[in-house]
Amino acid sequence: MTKSANTKRCIKIVVSVTLRLCYHAMENSLAIIGAGRVGRALGRRLRELAWKIGCVVTRREASARRAVRFIGAGKPCAGMTRQILASSVILIATPDDEIPGVAQQLARIGAEELRGKVVLHTSGALDSRVLDTAREHGAAVGSMHPLQSFSGVTVPSLEGKVFAVEGDARAVRVARQITRALGGSPVRITGGKKVLYHAAAAMAAGHVLAVEEAATQLLVSLGMRRSEAVRALLPLTRQVLENFERLGPRAAWTGPLSRGDYKVVKAHLEALRDSPEEFAEAYDALNGLAARVLAQGVAGMLAELKNVSVQRKPKTKVMGSNA
């Protein structure tokens, strides 16, 4: 190989590496709109991973400054500003009903500068169509939802957590890169079905919590201290979930309904007459759901449950959450 050829080859390598570094630096710059629990937590984790944090946008500068302090980097911005466009990735972490308006404002202030940007939102229920205004101006749009609860006090570990991603190809690619960098596992969801994914998450989190609290209140109504009731129920719940993971749903299913003991099921419903009506209604509905998703003879079990359902009289008693 001649000296000239070597020189050309070296120049190509240098140019290639330089372009990669520039591309990497550009891809790893992030603006955050909406600095609530999710926005702050993701911002902090990404800052720890050497992402360059640009604008952190909230309605008021004081809250933006607090968010920047929590994240450890960024420029506090009160309201939408063109400085957002200095970052290559724009993360919208506002409440769901504000996301379409944010996209419209981005289009208004960005216009042609949106071309080539990646705009992601973190809603669990909404898909990327709410960002169509930004898409029309050349941005690649998508959504990235971590299947994780955020307390706002500490930053949870995202290691092994599932992130639902969807949207344009480039936006999905960036969402996957972010997810993997955070230690998460990206799962692509069909945009039009995303709300069903969110319903599943709500059942597994919020509804399980409601059932656990209802059971706790029932034990408290019998004279247990709340701490005793929680201590009694949590190991039971944990064991069921561990069995669900290890053995599968049917093998983990316990209780009178799993054994076809309808007399006990009816006795439970009778005992719940003195509780607020939602308790017996939920117990009844959950029996039906268990029959539908766990029983082998679904029709027969549903028929038996219909026979033992208790017709309730209206009640006014209220069981407080701090009973």
Task: Give the role of each language-model region.
Residues 5, 14-17, 25, 318, ...:
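Acidic, Ala/Val/Gly-enriched low-complexity intrinsically disordered segments
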Residues 23-82:
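NAD(P)+-binding Rossmann beta1-loop-alpha1 motif at the extreme N-terminus of oxidoreductases
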Residues 55-58, 119-122, 163-166:
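Short, hydrophobic beta-strand segments that form beta-sheet elements in well-ordered domains
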Residues 65-70, 134, 138-139, 155-246:
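Internal alpha-helical scaffold of NAD(P)-dependent oxidoreductase catalytic cores
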Residues 71-154:
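Rossmann-like NAD(P)(H) cofactor-binding subdomain of soluble oxidoreductases
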Residues 240-300, 308:
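Interdomain hinge/lid region at the active-site interface
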